[in-house]
Design a protein with these regions (language model features):
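Divalent-cation
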Residues: 10, 15-178
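Membrane-water interface of transmembrane alpha-helices in multipass transporters/channels
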Residues: 1-5
């Protein structure tokens, strides 16, 4: 899906600034305005631009929270609908921005201990409770956020971005792997 592809791009962007620069250059070139069969539709181009804005916002927020050792748990819905997870939190339906993400996870904020769920390029809900992995072979050094990210990725096709409060490390869980 388009969201999954863009979230994979998040990983590359977060961990490799040189690749980010190259991708931004390609995105600005006129070549990106065409696809194999001709022009992209205006709606497709607008959606791609919106997804790119979301990716950039998540990257900036993740980097800022990492620098400040602020823990975060962000779930990006794919094909599996996460209705039960969303209903465990507070529905907010907010535009994605680094400031909004930072406010959600700011220590002491009402929703900071749960996960934020992203759907269709928006923050759908926050303060959501995720299932913990039942796997006992996971390192004892991993905290609850990481165990929840793995548990969520075992039960759905969601991509989960975790920022460690302890180390500031940014991790991604997908298909049961961190």
């Amino acid at each position: 899906s388009l969201v999954f592809n863009n979230l994979l791009l998040v990983l590359v962007i977060i961990f490799t600034p040189e690749i980010r620069h190259a991708l931004e250059s390609v995105g600005r070139s006129s070549v990106s305005k065409f696809n194999f069969f001709g022009f992209r539709s205006g709606a497709e181009e607008k959606r791609r631009e919106e997804m790119q804005k979301m990716v950039n916002a998540v990257c900036r927020a993740s980097s800022d929270m990492s620098d400040k050792h602020i823990g975060a748990l962000m779930v990006f819905e794919q094909e599996t609908i996460l209705g039960d997870i969303i209903s465990s939190g507070t529905v907010i339906d907010a535009k994605v921005s680094p400031e909004m993400i930072g406010n959600i996870f700011y220590p002491g904020a009402p929703l900071h201990d749960g996960a934020a769920v992203f759907r269709d390029g928006r923050i759908c809900a926050a303060g959501c409770i995720l299932p913990l992995t039942p796997n006992h072979d996971i390192s004892s050094e991993l905290g609850t956020r990481h165990r929840a990210s793995i548990g969520m990725s075992e039960q759905s096709d969601a991509v989960i971005v975790v920022v460690s409060e302890e180390t500031g490390a940014i991790s991604v869980a997908y298909k049961g792997r961190l």
